[in-house]
């Protein structure tokens, strides 16, 4: 009985069910305004330095500049698309998406 009450309390508090924005059909499209990378279908909420906000952007393609992961809510540079790895082949150059 206690387990059932804990489950109901978790559902009511939103701890058990995922947020609506986490479901793919509710994710934002490219160019939509965002506050967190998890809101975007691409997984990249890029900072817009001109307007001070952020927008959903596509992930980096092969040989494009990238950052391997997001440490905060928004990205400075988007991570690579699926199947690509964000690495630097030269210590003097920035990271880019490569197939490995």
UniProtKB/Swiss-Prot annotation:
It is found in: Secreted. Transmembrane segments: none annotated. GO terms for biological process: digestion; lipid catabolic process; response to food. GO terms for molecular function: enzyme activator activity. Keywords: Disulfide bond, Secreted, Signal. Residues 1-21 form the signal peptide. InterPro entries: Colipase. GO terms for cellular component: extracellular region. It comes from the Eukaryota. Disulfide bonds join 34-45, 40-56, 44-78, 66-86, 80-97. PROSITE patterns: COLIPASE_2. Belongs to the colipase family. This is Colipase-like protein 2. It comes from Homo sapiens (Human). The lineage of its organism: Eukaryota, Metazoa, Chordata, Craniata, Vertebrata.
């Amino acid at each position: 009985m206690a387990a059932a009450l804990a489950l109901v309390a978790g559902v009511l508090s939103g701890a058990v069910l995922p947020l609506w924005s986490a479901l793919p059909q509710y994710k934002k499209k490219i160019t939509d305004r965002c506050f967190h990378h998890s809101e975007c279908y691409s997984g990249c909420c890029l900072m817009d330095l001109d307007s001070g906000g952020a927008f959903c952007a596509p992930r980096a393609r092969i040989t494009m500049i990238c950052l391997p992961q997001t440490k905060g809510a928004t990205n400075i540079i988007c991570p690579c698309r699926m199947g690509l790895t964000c690495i630097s082949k030269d210590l003097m150059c920035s990271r880019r998406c490569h197939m490995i």
